[in-house]
Design a protein with these regions (language model features):
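Extracellular/periplasmic, surface-exposed regions of secreted and cell-surface proteins
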Residues: 68, 116-117, 252, 302-311, ...
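Acidic, glycine-rich flexible loop segments
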Residues: 213-239, 253, 334-368
Length: 673
């Protein structure tokens, strides 16, 4: 029972319409939820605006908050897997704080994988959404064909992802609290050979190479020790995956949000927290955490204010604070895990790092073993702080002509990060039989051979040193102004958009070439839409913009696209029925471009050279400058090396895209194709 007779019970379920029922001190309530059949009158976010879903002629896929929250991954990119047709994601790492997936729209459509990334806009501004809290996302729309992306010109060839954040709605304040606890585990761990098997295969390989039995890296005595496992310090057998890694790692994610407002003021505020732990075990003898971890704080505040009956001001602020922790010297830890030999070290023994002598088994390379690069080297802590600000002012101009409006938008983003390093060093203990190093010259098979263990100590336990590593500062701004027109004349609906935008990024490619030269874009956008009774639909889009990567006379281009649609079920000869609810055929064709050359910029600049540059062989082996000419002359000569050849004719990639599609709803919109 509920003592307050004015209490309201809110019932909701994914896929059904929510209901609010007054309790009135009743002991039992029966609630029947209606299926949430999406109306064709609903609007969908498109480039620089919204359109009714019924009149869309472009290829657009969408996913909402509920679907994203079904798989609460640390990175939103991993939640998109399997959610959107035509969108593929590839996750190359599970490292906490660095597990973002690469996203491709309709495959890799560029010369390089790096150049095939789609353009990502959050609330209409180019930003990363990888570390956003899914609780603050209203929808993610993916624009796939030329009709939907032509307005982005030189940046639309690989598709566009539009992320829209949540905003407040008129009504009482609603407080939402969510908490998720989960585990992460590797999809598959390699099966590795034990010491005896590894040594046996190595002996077999040496015999195949013609090595005599008395010259084999592993003697019969060595093989017997591996087989019996009776000398685990000198002849260890370690599965490094099992030794260093846990089966699973814990991830927690929490969020609290509040939204509501009045007719004139609406608000949405969200606070999120995420902690992602790594898979590695804490090793003995260390006074710091040797595991990977990532802590993230998300915050967002969106405010909509009706200044007058015709003027609306929208303000948005968001931020992400991240703290990523990585063991020092562990950049290639997964490669080292795979390469590390089971007999390279017994691991940490009584709080001491013990490693096998590198020459114990002649011819066996034991460099780059994981215990050497992972234990005792300290850690790196990367702190990042990202903030975004948006301001949008829209003015209804119905007093001039019905359906006319103007909109002005400005945005500012700032990103700052730095790395703090904590470095240390620990003693290394190398085990020997006593008679191996006492100068007796005895063979291990001799009865007087002393097999008691002694250790040779190298290095020293050093106090931790602290330093600051790489710093990154970036900022950018974006401005946009548009005139919009939407009006209905009887059964005819017309719409138009004329938009100007400009942006500039400072320190965009740090630390790559030309990182200190800002990146700038400027462009014009046009759109015309028409439909008759939502049955016959036509749309024309055009983008005129350019890229500073190319020569001035090849910097700007025009990118047009057109599309048509025909809703067959609106015809009178198809009676209304529950089997085929909606059927639309659509087609589009358009020209789009791609100027994403990864880290390469200003490809039109004259040829460049470097003087007295080191050849990589000299760098690797002798650290000498210049080059050697001839076989007998060993003196390094000053020389010039080509760096980049300029090409004033190079321009963006272009793609002429065609798209044909059918939208069909069956069984009262329960099945959608």
């Amino acid at each position: 029972t509920v003592p307050d007779g004015n209490s309201i019970l809110s019932v909701s379920f994914i896929g059904y319409q929510s209901q609010e029922i007054k309790v009135n001190s009743r002991r039992g309530i029966n609630v029947r939820l209606q299926e949430n059949v999406q109306s064709l009158d609903e609007v969908m976010v498109v480039a620089y605006g919204v359109q009714k879903k019924a009149t869309l002629t472009g290829a657009i896929s969408s996913v909402g908050t509920e679907a994203l929250l079904k798989s609460p991954s640390a990175s939103v990119t991993n939640s998109l897997a399997g959610q959107l047709p035509g969108v593929s994601s590839m996750q190359a790492s599970g490292q906490p704080g660095a597990d973002n997936a690469k996203i491709f729209v309709r495959g890799v459509g560029s010369l390089t994988e790096g150049g095939a990334a789609p353009l990502i806009l959050v609330d209409g501004v180019e930003r990363s959404f990888y570390q956003m809290d899914p609780n603050e996302i209203e929808s993610i729309n993916v624009l796939k064909d030329a009709s939907a992306t032509a307005v982005f010109g030189v940046r639309g060839a690989n598709g566009v992802i539009l992320v829209t954040t949540r905003r407040g709605e008129e009504g009482k304040a609603k407080i939402s609290i969510s908490s998720n606890v989960g585990i992460q585990m590797p999809t598959r761990i390699l099966d590795v050979a034990d010491s005896y098997t590894t040594a046996s295969l190595f002996r077999e390989a040496q015999r195949n190479d013609g090595v005599a039995d008395d010259q084999l890296a592993f003697s019969e005595y060595d093989m017997e020790r591996f087989r019996l496992g009776d000398s685990p310090i000198l002849y260890p057998n370690v599965n490094w995956y099992d030794y260093l890694m846990n089966k699973a790692a814990v991830q927690t994610q929490h969020n609290v949000s509040i939204s509501g407002g009045t007719k004139d003021i609406r608000y949405f505020v969200s606070l999120g927290f995420l902690f992602q732990n790594g898979l590695f075990k804490q090793l003995d003898g260390l006074d710091y955490d040797n595991n990977y971890s990532y802590t993230r704080y998300n915050y967002r505040a969106n405010l909509d204010v009706n200044l007058t009956r015709t003027t609306t001001l929208k303000f948005g602020m968001g931020g992400i604070v991240g703290n990523q922790r990585d063991p020092g010297g562990s950049g290639n830890v997964w490669k080292q895990l795979t390469w590390s030999l089971p007999f390279s070290s017994p691991g940490i023994v009584d709080g001491k790092k013990v490693v096998t002598q590198s020459t114990r088994f002649p011819g066996v390379k034991m460099e780059n073993q994981v215990i050497n690069g992972f234990y005792g080297y300290g850690y790196d802590r990367k702190v990042s702080n990202n903030m975004t600000f948006d301001l949008n002012l829209s003015q209804n101009l119905d007093f001039i002509t019905k359906g006319l409006s103007i909109e002005v938008k400005g945005a500012y983003n700032t990103d700052y990060s730095y790395i703090k390093t904590v470095r240390g060093h620990v003693e290394t203990y190398t085990p020997f039989y006593k008679s191996e190093i006492d100068g007796s010259g005895l063979d291990v098979e001799d009865l007087d051979f002393d097999k008691s263990l002694v250790y040779r100590i190298t290095g020293e336990n050093m106090m931790k040193t602290y330093g600051t590593g790489d710093k990154k500062r970036a900022r950018d701004w974006y401005v946009e102004g548009s005139i919009r027109y939407n009006r209905k004349f009887g059964e005819h609906n017309v719409g138009a958009l004329l938009l100007y935008n400009q942006s500039k990024k400072y320190y965009p490619n740090y630390p790559n070439k030309f990182w200190d030269v800002p990146t700038a874009y400027v462009g014009l956008v046009g759109r015309l839409t028409y439909d008759y009774k939502s049955k016959y639909i036509a749309e024309f889009n055009i983008g005129y913009n350019g890229s500073e990567n190319f020569a001035p006379d090849k910097r700007f281009g025009t990118f047009p696209a057109g599309s048509i649609g025909y809703v067959i079920t609106e015809e009178k000869f198809i009676p209304k029925n529950d089997f085929l609810t909606y059927l639309k055929v659509r087609a589009s064709v358009g020209l789009v471009g791609n100027d994403n050359m990864s880290s390469n910029r200003f490809l039109y600049l004259p040829d460049s050279y470097s003087i007295n540059n080191s050849d990589w062989l000299q760098q690797a082996y002798q650290d000498k400058n210049g080059y050697i000419f001839g076989l007998t002359n060993t003196a390094y000569q000053v020389a010039a090396k080509e760096l980049m050849l300029g090409n004033s004719n190079v321009t963006w990639e272009t793609a002429l895209k065609q798209n044909y599609g059918i939208d069909a709803y069956f069984f009262s919109d329960r099945l959608k194709l």
